[in-house]
């Protein structure tokens, strides 16, 4: 059995053997899946620089949940720009980073979902797609993407526990549609990725659960399976 310290050493050695001086990990998943919590815990464990989804300072998010059709395009463009800037920062510096949600989730899940629900016009959606296509040519995917797979009851429970006022109006059908799109997206995602089933995990409070996730990440990076 390899101890935790040995795994950390192996993980760091992999980074240097790959001939790179930085690692980009990304945490993906639906609203309430635990992305931000896991990002924080992993950033402390690996001493990586965390990059969080800009939610609290987002000038559109509260308006969006009150009137999705009116503010959907504004919100998605804001997120697209914020995540693009994060990727530009990664390319400029030599720091290892861990990212809370990716630019691909915006383009392949949230924006198409809003369009299919009639909450984003075809004109706005096509404009969004053109912007993303231009951006995507200038950035690389993360070295490892960790997808947190969660059921609707698990998502709802987490959303209720964190108590964000603007999330009170999130509809169940909205979460279901997002979950369906996440599953479709991850099944066709080609770069290196890892799927974690989180319904029966409490990595925020249980160190063994967190340790199990860390072991899977390190094994994936090191090519142990």
Which positions does each model-derived feature cover?
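P-loop (Walker A) phosphate-binding loop of NTP-binding proteins
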Residues: 30
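Hydrophobic anchor at the beta1->P-loop junction of P-loop NTPases
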Residues: 27
């Amino acid at each position: 059995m390899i101890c935790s310290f040995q795994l950390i050493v192996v993980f760091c050695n992999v980074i240097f053997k790959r001939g790179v001086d930085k690692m980009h990990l990304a945490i993906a998943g639906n609203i309430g899946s635990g992305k931000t919590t896991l990002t924080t815990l992993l950033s402390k464990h690996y001493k990586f620089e965390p990059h969080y989804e800009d939610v609290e300072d987002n000038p559109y998010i509260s308006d969006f949940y009150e009137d999705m059709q009116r503010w959907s395009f504004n919100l998605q463009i804001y997120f697209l720009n914020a995540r693009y800037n994060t990727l530009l920062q990664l390319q400029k510096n030599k720091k290892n980073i861990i990212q809370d949600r990716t630019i691909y989730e915006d383009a392949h899940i949230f924006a198409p979902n809003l369009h299919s629900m009639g909450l984003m016009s075809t004109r706005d959606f096509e404009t969004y797609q053109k912007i993303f296509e231009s951006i995507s040519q200038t950035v690389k995917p993360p070295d490892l993407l960790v997808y947190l797979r969660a059921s609707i009851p698990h998502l709802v429970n987490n959303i209720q526990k964190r108590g964000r006022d603007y999330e009170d109006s999130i509809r169940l059908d909205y979460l279901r549609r997002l979950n369906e799109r996440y599953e479709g997206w991850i099944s066709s995602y080609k770069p290196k990725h890892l799927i974690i089933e989180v319904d029966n995990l409490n990595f925020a409070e249980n160190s063994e659960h967190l340790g199990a996730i860390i072991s899977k990440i390190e094994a994936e990076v090191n090519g142990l399976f």
